[in-house]
Swiss-Prot record:
<keyword id="KW-0874">Quinone</keyword>
<keyword id="KW-0520">NAD</keyword>
<dbReference type="GO" id="GO:0003954">
    <property type="term" value="F:NADH dehydrogenase activity"/>
</dbReference>
<dbReference type="Pfam" id="PF01257">
    <property type="entry name" value="2Fe-2S_thioredx"/>
</dbReference>
<dbReference type="InterPro" id="IPR002023">
    <property type="entry name" value="NuoE-like"/>
</dbReference>
<dbReference type="InterPro" id="IPR042128">
    <property type="entry name" value="NuoE_dom"/>
</dbReference>
<dbReference type="GO" id="GO:0046872">
    <property type="term" value="F:metal ion binding"/>
</dbReference>
<dbReference type="GO" id="GO:0051537">
    <property type="term" value="F:2 iron, 2 sulfur cluster binding"/>
</dbReference>
<dbReference type="InterPro" id="IPR041921">
    <property type="entry name" value="NuoE_N"/>
</dbReference>
<keyword id="KW-1278">Translocase</keyword>
<comment type="similarity">
    <text>Belongs to the complex I 24 kDa subunit family.</text>
</comment>
<keyword id="KW-0408">Iron</keyword>
<feature type="binding site">
    <location>
        <position position="93"/>
    </location>
    <ligand>
        <name>[2Fe-2S] cluster</name>
    </ligand>
</feature>
<comment type="function">
    <text>NDH-1 shuttles electrons from NADH, via FMN and iron-sulfur (Fe-S) centers, to quinones in the respiratory chain. Couples the redox reaction to proton translocation (for every two electrons transferred, four hydrogen ions are translocated across the cytoplasmic membrane), and thus conserves the redox energy in a proton gradient.</text>
</comment>
<keyword id="KW-0001">2Fe-2S</keyword>
<feature type="binding site">
    <location>
        <position position="129"/>
    </location>
    <ligand>
        <name>[2Fe-2S] cluster</name>
    </ligand>
</feature>
<feature type="binding site">
    <location>
        <position position="133"/>
    </location>
    <ligand>
        <name>[2Fe-2S] cluster</name>
    </ligand>
</feature>
Length: 167
């Protein structure tokens, strides 16, 4: 398979170090960290060439890598905004107001679920349990978790991210 994606020098070195942590016959086990690395290098999403590249690097069929990428919600197969807002909508968060948090996000950002703002700054998604049920409702924005959210706290967060934390 030919690809249009390659790791940059820094990430190639990191990928090689990750692969070395696994026995030679088990290097396919490095699929999760390598897909994550590819996604981070590519601005938060995994195009087909990146999945192909990782599969080739791990000497595994593309379809196996694709199955992993589509199974885990942490991988995005479509472009996402600079800030990916993921609202947990499972039962504990829903009981504590995740629907209201979602509505605030939609209203404040002017988009619906699974959409990205025109300026490519925000993407709004729902996500399955983030494992912080005791502090529901929970939202993940990129790599950061925000717990015990209220509508007011969510509005403030969106304002801070809108301004790239400059104020």
């Amino acid at each position: 398979m030919s690809t249009n994606f390659t790791f940059d020098k820094k990430n190639l070195n990191l990928a090689e170090d990750i692969i070395k942590k696994y026995p030679p016959h088990g290097k396919r086990s490095a699929i999760l960290p390598l897909l994550d690395l590819a996604q981070r290098q590519n601005g938060g999403w995994l195009p087909v060439p990146a999945i192909e590249y990782v599969a080739n690097m791990l000497e595994m069929p593309y379809m196996r890598a694709y199955e992993v990428a589509t199974f885990y919600s942490m991988f995005n197969l479509k472009r996402v905004g600079k800030y990916h807002i993921q609202v947990c909508t499972t039962t504990p968060c829903w009981l504590h107001g995740s629907d209201d948090i979602m509505k605030i996000c939609e209203k404040k950002l002017g988009i619906k679920l699974k959409e990205t703002t025109e300026d490519q700054k925000f993407t709004l998604s729902e996500i399955e349990c983030l494992g912080a049920c005791v502090n529901a409702p929970v939202v993940q924005i990129n790599d950061d978790y925000y717990e015990d959210l209220t509508e007011e706290k969510m509005e403030k967060l969106i304002d801070e991210y809108s301004n790239d934390f400059k104020n």
